[in-house]
């Protein structure tokens, strides 16, 4: 489960940003195409925050839907996988424009 190490890294990033202040809430953005399972991050969060400035912090996850842009006709459309064809022209040269995110969006500290 790589979500454990990802969650540990998120906590480290939050602690550095908090500059010694207690962390009350963390909001993450996780894209549907990121390969990260939000439920697994939620499961790991409590264990990863134990004994840190983020212990007891609330975690919210904003899920970012996948979107792609067709390289052939420039149509922007929802994608669920990297292999979705363009619904307008059927081409497979799709550039992902959203859904790969994995970032700390907000941090609430004391």
Swiss-Prot record:
A Pfam family this chain is assigned to: HypA
One GO process term, biological-process aspect? protein modification process
Print the keywords alphabetically.
Metal-binding, Nickel, Zinc
Q: Fetch the InterPro entries from UniProt.
A: Hydgase_Ni_incorp_HypA/HybF_CS (IPR020538), HypA/HybF (IPR000688)
Which residues of the sequence carry a binding annotation for Zn(2+)? 70, 73, 86, 89
At which positions is Ni(2+) bound?
2
Kindly list the GO molecular function terms attached to this UniProt entry: nickel cation binding; zinc ion binding
Q: Which domain of life is it from?
A: Bacteria
Q: Which function does this protein serve?
A: Involved in the maturation of [NiFe] hydrogenases. Required for nickel insertion into the metal center of the hydrogenase.
Family the entry assigns? Belongs to the HypA/HybF family.
User: Under what name is this protein listed?
Assistant: Hydrogenase maturation factor HypA
